[in-house]
Swiss-Prot record:
Cofactor: Mg(2+)
Protein name according to UniProt: DNA integrity scanning protein DisA
Role this protein plays: Participates in a DNA-damage check-point that is active prior to asymmetric division when DNA is damaged. DisA forms globular foci that rapidly scan along the chromosomes during sporulation, searching for lesions. When a lesion is present, DisA pauses at the lesion site. This triggers a cellular response that culminates in a temporary block in sporulation initiation.
Reactions the enzyme catalyzes: 2 ATP = 3',3'-c-di-AMP + 2 diphosphate
Gene: disA
Species this chain originates from: Bacillus cereus (strain AH187)
EC numbers on record: 2.7.7.85
Principal EC category: transferase
Boundaries of every DAC domain copy: 8-146
Amino acid sequence: MEENKQRVKSMINILQLVAPGTPLREGIDNVLRAQTGGLIVLGYNEQIKSIVDGGFHINCAFSPASLYELAKMDGALILNETGSKILISNAQLVPESSIDSIETGMRHRTAERVAKQTGSLVVAISQRRNVITLYQGNLRYTLKDIGVILTKANQAIQTLEKYKAVWNDGITNLGILEFEEVVTMSEVVHVLHSVEMVLRIKNEILSYIHELGTEGRLIRLQLTELLADLEAEAALLIKDYYQEKTQDHHQILKKLQELANTQLLEDSDLVKLLGYPGQTSLEESVTPRGYRITSKISRVPPLIIENLINRFKTLQGVCRATINELDDVEGIGEVRAKKIREGLKRIQEHLYMSRHN
């Protein structure tokens, strides 16, 4: 899993470097349109030095126009790691010929071998096929047309909307069961599965956003709007049902995100994520602490909610508390105690109305 996280992080960094709207991408697109082809290496360390033969050491500031003009030469361009300077033009690259390559064209084969030998980012721009291919270590990625990525991103947003609706239905049903004191592990796991799918699709959309660069602003806004409050509520859901109260619920949500990125989770995986043994029955009754529901009461800060849960232990404990008992909790006076009682009643009524709509 750690290796996969590293690969994802590397790919995000690479895509941000060559995303539309960046000077480097503008230069690459100019070369692509001119159909001259090109080979660009980012980074000039000892390993790169050992495979560079000839070339002109120009050490000038990067500009898209300079890249376009210098790419007309047959050799490779060597840039610094950030792409802000062009260090060498028309360089011949001589990587180890024994390094395996799946490529057939000379330019792409050289790019793949250089990337594998040095770990540097290498960009190969095809002369005839209008394709930009990125290499770094064993990573290989072909940049897609912006129109294709936008179509995929919009499809993913539509899919996310469907899973958001599944989440809304599940969390509404769970809220009703919480007030009725009939929650089982099955209902909690069902809601967590919808969180898993939302997080999985979110990760896919983020990869499109990274690749789209400035063209992805609208997609990012849609994603932010769709996920508003969902992740915060999911963290409180975990806080409600995690076996040990002291566990950091944000860390558990982060772990769920990591797992969702790498595999489809079974019911037992989610049960274990909540701190229970994997063989725990899904029919087992579970009791919410009440963080998620009480956080919906207006003008009740998190510190007061913490005091409430510490005093009454569960959501039902809070619901059953009298005005005087609520008044005894630190930070809650008579006025706030009444607001808490009224707030819980309104939330319960809203949940029942939502289920029947």
